[in-house]
UniProtKB/Swiss-Prot annotation:
It comes from Macrococcus caseolyticus (strain JCSC5402). GO terms for cellular component: cytoplasm. Signal peptide: none annotated. This is Segregation and condensation protein A. Coiled coil: none annotated. Keywords: Cell cycle, Cell division, Chromosome partition, Cytoplasm. Belongs to the ScpA family. InterPro entries: ScpA, ScpA-like_C. It is found in: Cytoplasm.
Amino acid sequence: MYEVKLASFHGPLDLLLHLIKQYEIDIYDISMKILTEQYINYIKDVTDLDINVHGDYLVMASELLRIKSRMLLPESTETVEETEDPREGLMNQLIEYQNYRMLAEILNEKKKEEEKYFIKRGNDLSRFEKVDTSLELELVDLITAYYKAKQRQHVVKPTISMARDTYSIEDATKNIIENLQQKQSITFADFVTFSETKTQIVTLFMALLELMKTETVKIRQERTFGDIYIERGRRYNG
């Protein structure tokens, strides 16, 4: 029997994008009948479903059913123009998440390119050796964590400070290090929720990549789809 697992996806939106591509569904005019049926069929067939870990998938299933049922309700001709499309919220989430996935791929490619080069500092007389640049979490996990944080930004109050004009990698790097001077670890969700522009977000990821590569910081995740923490790395010197 073919095993269907959720481990290959980074959350319900990732699965939805997979189904949209597989069944050639227009993301701007989503067929809720097809998408809902295929999503629920997929969830029913998974062999590694753990409610404690994959609860988000079940929440999305109920949301899809809610949207589908709303679309089946008859609309008054007088209010058709004023009625909001029940799919609009889902469509916006999918498009935004798709953009962050693309960003993750771009950053991943940049990371691979940078790993081809190794810098020997002039005052470092130790034996030259390649630094292990493997990450404890993939970039797409960071993107997913950011997306979830943005969804919670109206209910989660940021607990750390972040400069409003953080546009350079140097500024973002300094900001991360300064926050780690005050705390042993930073909740990733709180940190990026305070980012106000996409420029800041990209800059933050680039700075975090550099700090992780030099082992100045490290990241950990206690459970799948749980909060991601930025912590002081082996070479942190704040």
